[in-house]
């Protein structure tokens, strides 16, 4: 009797994947042959998410799913992962990208703005990791990639809440790496610098010039720069990389 060693078709859940970095990650994973669950935070964005998922399916021949879920809510995060597992039969990759900002100086920051950022960026990552890890442990395989930020590594004035949430993601990732490595599950954090997204589009020209002046590469990053790194960390080839924080910032943090 010949043992079946064929690699199963891999599937991925990408939170916050209807735009920006998350959208680029979903596209990159679909291009690499992963079935992809696209996520938006509420029903308002579901039509757009479904259209994006359908385009991925048509362009890359993979299976897709679009799910509206607020990852800050544990029940909705569980429902998101459960829906992907039911649709694809397994969940091999989780990319925690969903995140928000509520910037302001500490002395004037409202408690609700601090709580909202922590709830989505950190608690949301925890909720999805918990839901996915339970399934990954049973199948003895998994890749978890959590989006942190260079702000979580070095801090930034006016972003105490965001920096705290992204630093928390780093600590969570390292703890998960220690807990899950024996089950063939890796957990890594990607810490982007300034990437050309809706958030950076809101910057003034003067702010943009000041930021670019701090970057060795003298340009903002593209979402695709981040997506390619995530795709590698989500692959089987990255099986001996875990608990790491990889900055992708064009040399800004040198």
Predicted feature residues:
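Alpha-helical segment proximal to the catalytic Tyr-Lys
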Residues: 134, 178-182, 239
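Conserved glycine-rich cofactor-binding loop
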Residues: 18-20
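Conserved glycine-rich Rossmann-like NAD(P)H-binding loop of the short-chain dehydrogenase/reductase
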Residues: 32-51
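Active-site helix of classical SDR
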Residues: 129, 165, 173
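C-terminal substrate-recognition "lid" of short-chain dehydrogenase/reductases
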Residues: 88, 129, 137, 141, ...
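Residue(s) in the substrate-gating loop at a strand-loop-helix junction
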Residues: 149
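Substrate-binding pocket helix/loop in short-chain dehydrogenase/reductase
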Residues: 105-106, 110-118, 200, 211
């Amino acid at each position: 009797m010949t043992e079946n060693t064929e690699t199963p078709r891999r599937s991925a859940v990408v939170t916050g994947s209807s735009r920006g970095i998350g959208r680029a990650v979903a596209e990159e994973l679909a291009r690499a042959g992963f079935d992809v669950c696209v996520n938006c935070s509420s029903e308002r964005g579901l039509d757009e998410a479904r259209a994006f998922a359908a385009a991925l399916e048509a362009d890359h021949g993979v299976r897709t799913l679009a799910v509206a879920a607020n990852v800050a809510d544990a029940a909705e995060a569980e429902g998101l992962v459960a829906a992907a597992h039911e649709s694809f039969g397994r969940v091999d990759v989780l990319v925690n990208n969903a995140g928000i900002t509520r910037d302001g100086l500490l002395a004037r920051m409202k408690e609700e703005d601090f709580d909202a950022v922590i709830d989505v960026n950190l608690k949301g990552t925890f909720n999805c990791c918990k839901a996915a890890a339970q399934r990954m442990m049973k199948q003895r395989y998994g890749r978890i990639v959590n989006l942190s930020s260079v702000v979580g590594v070095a801090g930034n004035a006016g972003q105490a809440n965001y920096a705290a949430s992204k630093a928390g993601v780093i600590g969570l990732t390292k703890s998960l790496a220690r807990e899950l490595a024996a089950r063939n599950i890796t957990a890594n954090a990607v810490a982007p610098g300034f990437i050309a997204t809706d958030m950076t589009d809101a910057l003034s020209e003067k702010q943009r010039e000041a930021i670019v002046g701090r970057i060795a590469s003298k340009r903002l990053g593209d979402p695709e720069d981040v997506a390619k790194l995530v795709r590698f960390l989500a692959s089987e080839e990255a099986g001996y990389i875990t608990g790491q924080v990889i900055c992708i910032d064009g040399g800004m943090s040198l």
